[in-house]
Amino acid sequence: MKQTANLTLLICVFLCLGNKAQAQVFLKSEYISPSKFKDKNGNKLRGKGDLKTIDGGIRIPVCIKMDENNKPIAWAIALTGTYASLGNKDISKDYATSEILNAQVGVMHVRPLNEKWSILATLGAGIYTSNLDKISGKSILGQGGILFIGHAKPNFDWGVGVAINNALGYPMIFPSFYLDWRLGGIYDFKLSMYDSFQLSLSSQINDNFKLSIVGESKGLMSAVEKDGKNMYFVSQYGYAGIQPEYKIAKDLAVYATGGVSLTRDTYFQSRTLKAFYKSEDNYPHFGVSAYFSVGIKYGF
């Protein structure tokens, strides 16, 4: 099974706080236009579908203080959520559901170990469901982890650790990895990998306007019951596009993205250990589609 973005708490959101003592809020809406549906062998099946999402979150620093090396010791609370509507037309229920809700709340703590290393610990829970009318205990997952972060250079951080969740109905420990690489100059380059893959190349046109080429791979999942069995429904997609961003106040900005969704897999997976570690070369998927999004963010 491909590990989706929501199997572990979004640890990387806390790293965005840095030494900022203010809250961060974001709201984003995405649209992927309709495209033909194909099986895992690439054969076109009857039907097509689109995807619409609303994604938002708030991160509140509860306590931040700096040590003697000017590195943060901090506690924070984060609440994030995504609602996705899958506009499936003439697609069998064997391949897709009509909606997904992923919502997480967590408490996070970071502290430096020395000048080169920090430790980040998280503890939280989330709801992962495709049935908003009846949210069962099986769709509520606990999650947490410990990540050791190495500050190799001022623009390069990497980390290793462990994550724990009850995605299979009982606690399991998984390895976790983190990478954040930034390059400045005429163009700003950023590569980030933890729960999702993010890539951007940006140019600051003036004090208020920034233009970027962006790419991201992300995923959603829900705990479902299918044919009397406990399963997960997984939707994973990636996109690349042009993103203009305009700062309308000191800490407030709006942005929009237009581009292409390169891939969007949708499939059901058994909620078992064997299925979790099983990985297919290809999954049932939608074809290449147009991608659009708009968003607003504060405090970033």
Task: Indicate where each model-derived feature is located.
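Residue-level signature of outer-membrane beta-barrel architecture
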Residues: I60-I64, H109-R111, G150, W181, ...
